[in-house]
Every structure is written in C-alpha cells, then in structure tokens.
Amino acid sequence: GEILVHVITTSQEEHDLESLKEELLALPLEGKIVGIMHIINDSLSDVVQSDETRILYGQDFFYETLLGLRFKISTFSFFQPNSLAAEVLYSIVREYIGDTKDKVVFDLYSGTGTIAQLAASVADEVIGVEIVEEAVEAAKQNAALNNLSNCKFIAGDVLKVLDDLTEKPDVVILDPPRDGIHPKALPKILSYGVDHIVYISCKATSLARDLPAFLAAGYKLCLLYTS
C-alpha cells in the first residue's frame, strides 16, 4: 500500500529533516512512501494543527481502497486509520440499510464522504452534509474518482442545512463527532420519520445522551455493535 509520513515539530527547534527523509526512504517497509510532510505545530491541543505544512518528498496525499472504491486521502482528511476495521463497519452499515436502489439516503456529518459513496452504489441518491469545507471538497473529488453521479455533498452545519433541503430521506446515516448530535438538530432528524437510522458513534457517552431521544420518538434499538 501507499504510505504518507507526517513529521510534526514546533518552530522553536531546528531539525535535520533532509537526513531524516533519506532514512525514512531507506527503510525496508511493506508499503511505498509516496510523500513525507513536515507539519509545524505550535498550538497547545490534543490534536495536531498545522501552522505551516511543507512537502519534504513526493506528494501530500495517498490513495486507499475500501470495498471496491478508491479514495484520495490528504494530510488532514478525516478517514478511518484502520482500513480493515472500516470495511467491517461500512459493510454492516450497507447490509443494515438493505435495498435502497429507489431511495434517498442522508449521510449527516459525512466527513470526506466515504460512507455516502459506499451507500451510493445501492441507493438512488445520497446527500452528504459536512461542516468542514475541505472535507466536502475531498468528498466531491472522490465521488468523481469513483464515477458516482448520484452523490451530492453540501458544506454547512447540519442544524442549518436541514432547514434548506427540499429532499426527504428514506434512510438516515449519522456519524457525528465526539460531542454527538446537536440537541437542536435531533428533532429535525427525527421529524423525517424514516424507517431506518444508522448511528455510528465514536464516544459512548454522547450516544447514551442522544439515544433516549430516538427511543422517545418511537424508534427501537435493533442492532448494537461495539468494538
């Protein structure tokens, strides 16, 4: 496979990155290094933020294949790092939503559109909503890469975008950030009254907070997968 290396430092120290680059390229790896990035991060945070990004070698992206589709992944794209586990997860999602060839699927908090594009192969239309504009542009590029014409990606807050959409979904897929679904967006999502909702949670406490609203709206918890 392809490997994109990120070297993260502060601007307060100098490093011999040329020697490091040569050492990395000489490593006997199973995959091929297609790019080495130098990310300067002076922020105090539990996530990497780029104050400046430089290409030391090659390119700033790589390609990953999931369930027959190809995705271009850049430095700050949101993408599941464990591709084998991601394939298991996405296969479960696709199997659960079932035959959707004549149906409209909403993928809310769609990131780079991975789930939306996997659903597009078994749906009439998929609409993805994501607040990060860079992720939406990546989703559009990947949809074109996979020759998918029935995907539409919208940049914006789910809370606001749902007010403007004229389409009505038959299936809703939710993959919110760690904080879960915005409390004001939940009633809008539930008002569609779709038969199937898939909630992919990356934080159990957020799921536990949101789940009672679904149960109160008449939904039943049919399947629960944990890892």
Task: List each language-model region with its residue ranges.
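Rossmann-like S-adenosyl-L-methionine
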Residues: D16-E18, E22-S227
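Short, aliphatic-rich beta-strand segments
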Residues: G1-T9, R70-S74
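Helix N-cap motif at beta-to-alpha junctions
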Residues: T10-E14
